[in-house]
Amino acid sequence: MAIPKHIKDNISMPVIGAPLFLISGPDLVIAQCKAGIIGSFPALNARPQHVLEEWIIRIKTELAEYQEQNPDAKVAPFAVNQICHGSNDRLMQDMETCVKHEVPIIITSLRPPAEVVEAAHSYGGLVFHDVISVRHAKKAAE
């Protein structure tokens, strides 16, 4: 897949900052995006669930303000990593929050469920699936 133009035009290099469990949060994501790379965080890092919306609003607000103050800067989009496993009872509620705020990129881990892909695509969001092998990549593409 080629990098979509609206992303390519706003990144300094094709890099996604890893969504690190318990580490990645708004401060790191904002810094990454300001540096021109895609910042990301796991939705489950925002605890309790309502904090996810607060994080997304903060990230979007601070990046918009930075872009306004620095119109020539490449400010990359951000991503929310969704753990798509039966043990994640927040998945659909977290996706509702991501859809409400039109998170630019959703990163799925463990499996790419159709309902997550459809939800992200409903507003033009992109879905990247995190895989560890060629076999998993082929399975995700099915």
State what each model feature region is.
Residues 1-142:
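Active-site entrance/lid segments in N-terminal catalytic domains of soluble metabolic enzymes
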